[in-house]
C-alpha cells in the first residue's frame, strides 16, 4: 500500500495487523481520487475528514495532493497505531487524529470541504447518506461540500 500521487507519491503506508480492517486498495483509491479530481479540480486548501480512517490512506492521499488539513477518526486500536505511524513517517502537522466512534465525534474544529468514509463492510456504519446526516454526528460540512462513501458495488 502506498500514496498514489502528490507530494508523497510512492511513499509506503503500513496497514493494521490482523483482519479487523481491510485497507482500501491502491487501485480503488486511484479511481476514487481521479473521480474527485475531475469534480473538484484541485485538493489545494481543502479541509478533509477521513472517517473510519484505518491506516489513513484516504486522508493522507488528500494531504499529499494539497489538502490543508485532515481530521482522521478511528476507534480500532491496531488501526490507530498504523494511522499514527503513517502520519509520523510522513512528518505532517496537517493531520488531527481522534480516537473513538464516528457517531460520537463531536464538533469539528472547522467546516469541512470533503468528508470521506470507508467503513468496515457489513456493519451498517456507511448508512450516513448525506452531509446533513453527517452533521448529526458533529461534522460541520461547508455549504456545497461532498460526502464520499466507497462501496463494494462502486468498484466491482
Question: What role is predicted for each listed range?
Answer:
Residues 1-156:
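Class I S-adenosyl-L-methionine-dependent methyltransferase catalytic core
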